[in-house]
Amino acid sequence: MSKVGIVSWGAYIPKYRIRTEEVARIWGDDPLRIVDVYLVDEKSVESLDEDAVTIAVEAARRALKRAGINPKRIGAVYVGTESKPYAVKPISSILVDALGLSNNVFAVDMEFACKAGSEGLVAAIGLVESGRIEYGMTVGTDTSQGEPGEHLEYSASSGGASLIVGRDGVVAELEAVYSYVSDTPDFWRREGSPYPMHGEGFTGEPAYFRHIIGAARGLMERYGYKPSDFAYVVFHQPNGRFPVRAASMLNIPMEKVKPGIVVTHIGNTYNASALMGFAKVLDIAKPGDKILLVPFGSGAGSNAFVFTVTELITERQKSGVPTVEDMLRDKIYIDYAQYLKMRKMIKLFE
């Protein structure tokens, strides 16, 4: 029986961008210092008619188009997000109708901060491996928010990425998966609060690095992998510095990490962050390449996956679906006033 793996991928990045220097200008920060601290030059901003739902729909449509399969063959759809437009109403059920999926489908919105989308990947893999479904889909989508004037505003951005899992037409076979989770209060948002809070010193060592390194190193030790085995390594990207440092801690050369870095150009897309980097790598990967994917979610936890690219990757890369690199280049810059308007941050009270 053929291995389970990635059958297709799709991504969507809103074309609007705001430069770090524009945000810094408004708040009186030194733009050169801010860029140096976060290694984020600009970030993506959703338009007035976009939200986590529309972004998810577009990313998923592109994954379906690239796969060339009948949407009715999708047996499960999972959505990971921190930006639900509704407090009570799933995005996954909207995708069922928007994408033309069968009504006999498992549909769930997942929650685990920025790794909820990768939890959907784990769930889809499990259902396909069990034989319960033929294909499964996961989508990571967010229009992440940072409080005006707070440093999270420099990186919190918008985007979506989707993966389709199956046994037939696999472009990247799953070889291994590993998880590392603990109760770590690094980042949270209480009910009714418009913006999240973060635990300052908890966001680095106790949260991101402990769990990213724990998952990646744990996987390598359990399954006997070495850094030299991987052609590409993709980490969650809250800023430009963290994935670089994680690579250094694992003795992974930068040339294996750099191709999957997107945060410098679009900021932190939360649930789409690692999956977007993975999509960017799949756009250029060659048969035989091994890819290590390590998403992270605050609260906190990481999943680590190893995939091996198959001969079918070349065919999927010629599908005509926009690549991540295409979307990184397709952009329109806006100023801070337009940014506030598009993000619906201007509130009118009667």
Curated annotation (Swiss-Prot):
Binding site for CoA: R241
UniProt keyword annotations, A-Z: Acyltransferase, Isoprene biosynthesis, Transferase
CDD domains: init_cond_enzymes
EC number(s) on file: 2.3.3.10
UniProt organism field: Pyrobaculum aerophilum (strain ATCC 51768 / DSM 7523 / JCM 9630 / CIP 104966 / NBRC 100827 / IM2)
Record lineage: Archaea, Thermoproteota, Thermoprotei, Thermoproteales, Thermoproteaceae
InterPro entries in the cross-refs: ACP_syn_III_C, HMG_CoA_Synthase, Thiolase-like, Thiolase_N
Protein name stated in the entry: Hydroxymethylglutaryl-CoA synthase
Principal EC category: transferase
Function: Catalyzes the condensation of acetyl-CoA with acetoacetyl-CoA to form 3-hydroxy-3-methylglutaryl-CoA (HMG-CoA). Functions in the mevalonate (MVA) pathway leading to isopentenyl diphosphate (IPP), a key precursor for the biosynthesis of isoprenoid compounds that are building blocks of archaeal membrane lipids.
GO terms for MF: acetyl-CoA C-acetyltransferase activity; hydroxymethylglutaryl-CoA synthase activity
Top-level taxon of origin: Archaea
Residues annotated as the enzyme's active site: E82, C114, H236
Catalytic reaction(s) noted: acetoacetyl-CoA + acetyl-CoA + H2O = (3S)-3-hydroxy-3-methylglutaryl-CoA + CoA + H(+)
Subunit structure: Interacts with acetoacetyl-CoA thiolase that catalyzes the precedent step in the pathway and with a DUF35 protein. The acetoacetyl-CoA thiolase/HMG-CoA synthase complex channels the intermediate via a fused CoA-binding site, which allows for efficient coupling of the endergonic thiolase reaction with the exergonic HMGCS reaction.
Family: Belongs to the thiolase-like superfamily. Archaeal HMG-CoA synthase family.
Binding site for (3S)-3-hydroxy-3-methylglutaryl-CoA: D30, C114, S155, T203, H236, R245, N268, S298
